[in-house]
């Protein structure tokens, strides 16, 4: 079987996938795209250490011309859908890590692009792949806890100490500008994965923009909460964000 030729768009968020593509026996890392030259140099050194030939690009339009079977999207989280659609329409499979889309309009356009292309689209919300999440799924699907009626997911992570690093010091970086309910997948994803149930309605709330985050450039609330109704009538409370708590909290209950 020939190896799957993989390109990664986004060298910082995508570094884990870059390493896995280099190490996986059925994959071949062929290209990386990132606008920051230091990250490309890091990828160049990593590829050289492993004896792998990888093309490096600073522009997506050049990157998409490379001979690739699949693309890992690890670019800015609020820009995945347009790039996923371009990759699908060019005949590539797509893995998005993370997020899927920023609006309902983008969600519809993405689904339609997948259907037209016939290619595989994988949403790689990483907290769905923890051992504990698989244990939750196995127990629920086996019927150990009956039918789900209420669940809670919590992901509290104060990133203020690394904010300049993860935003590259950009005042208009998506982490500074997007509404706080946007990045809900760490808290909500494992519940949906474990139960296999689809959400049918949602209402969301933001906390106020706390001074310690506002000083770093954020424009939205410091944390977000969603109340989600699932297709069987179950309710899920999802809370996430950068509230001050040491240590951080990752917690799921069903």
Write out the residue ranges for each language-model feature.
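N-terminal Rossmann-like dinucleotide-binding module
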Residues: 1-50
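Predominantly a Rossmann-like dinucleotide-binding segment in NAD(P)-dependent oxidoreductases
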Residues: 12, 127-219
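Short, Asp-centered acidic motifs that coordinate Mg2+ and/or phosphate
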Residues: 31, 70, 150
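A short helix-to-beta-strand connector/capping loop
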Residues: 49-55, 116-120
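Short acidic low-complexity segments
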Residues: 55-66
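Beta-strand-loop-alpha-helix segment that lines the small-molecule cofactor/substrate pocket
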Residues: 69-70, 76-77, 81-129, 143
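Short, well-ordered coil/turn residues at beta-beta hairpins
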Residues: 74-75, 97, 230, 239
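NAD(P)-dinucleotide binding in Rossmann-like oxidoreductases
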Residues: 215-216, 231-254
